[in-house]
Amino acid sequence: MPAAYDLLALGAAACWALGSLISVGPSRHLGAFAFSRWRMLLVALMLWVATLTLSPWGGWQSLPPQSWWPLALSGLVGIFVGDVALFAAMNRLGPRRAGVLFATHAAFSAVLGFVVLGERIGLQAALGGVLTLAGVMTAILLGRRHDDAHAWEADRGHVGAGVLLALLAALCQALASLIVKPVMITPGVDPIAASAVRVSVATLAQFALLASGFAAARPTQRPTFAVLVQTGVNGFVAMGMGMTLVLVALKNGDVGTVAILSSVSPVLLLPLLWLRLGRPPAPAAWLGAGLTVVGTALILLR
């Protein structure tokens, strides 16, 4: 019987897959910094309302004073730096190639969880993790058809910079999970309130960067109503829901296992891209998807 936190991590992966599909247009319209800033602001407002009115876990009162600093640091590392780096990479490489590089956050998380937190996983789960990551990378690396000339697959800017930005985003995601894990295992901590703190701190950092005059923080184009709606929907699905599901999963799950299961989002993205672009991925992509399914099953049934 799969553990609840495993299913929550897979749910986060589904949210991120859908969110990445929604993000391409508004991210390229506004630029990585402006898109992230608008997204964080909208999500922060949503999470504050949810914490004050809807959360079943106790709201702000559930957060002990000593939890605020690690939550703030986790937000700065994982959301402020990591989020911007990921969308900057996506703008340069497209969602497919940025996704395969970002999937390395699972490997970073497993190593950091072992070294820093002393987390151990069994042989079956380890084999499942290897197959899952291999499947994700196979599906994306070999998932592009030779005749695919869609704008989402085009290179924009320096490819090497895009690769480094995607790897930076992956490392930031792993570090943020490591930082926030001790907070989430504290009994009674509200994951929605914790998410609100993380996103609010990252939002303040974004606006401070804009106020400093940093040129890249300015939007490349003025936001339209349609772009803001897409940004808000993306934020609700990927950050509001996806990130909160990960925090709930971290209450009982290991950092490495949660990261591995949540990294399958690029494979879940394959059928969504098929629907969106009107053509199936290359046959090798389905081989990768098959490996991911087998690996995920080994983890769930460990």
Where are these regions (language model features)?
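Membrane-interface interhelical linkers
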Residues: 1-10, 14, 20-34, 38-71, ...
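Structural signature of hydrophobic alpha-helical transmembrane segments
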Residues: 2-16, 64-77, 124-136, 190-204, ...
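Hydrophobic/small/kink-forming positions within alpha-helical transmembrane segments
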Residues: 17, 21, 48, 75-80, ...
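Membrane-helix interface/capping residues of multi-pass secondary transporters
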Residues: 32-33, 95, 121, 189-191, ...
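Juxtamembrane helix-start motifs in multi-pass secondary transporters
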Residues: 35-36, 98, 194
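Alpha-helical transmembrane segments of compact multi-pass small-molecule transporters, enriched
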Residues: 41-47, 101-115, 130, 201, ...
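Loop-to-transmembrane alpha-helix entry segments
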Residues: 61-65, 102, 115-138, 142-148, ...
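Juxtamembrane boundary at the C-terminal end of a transmembrane helix
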Residues: 251-252, 297-302
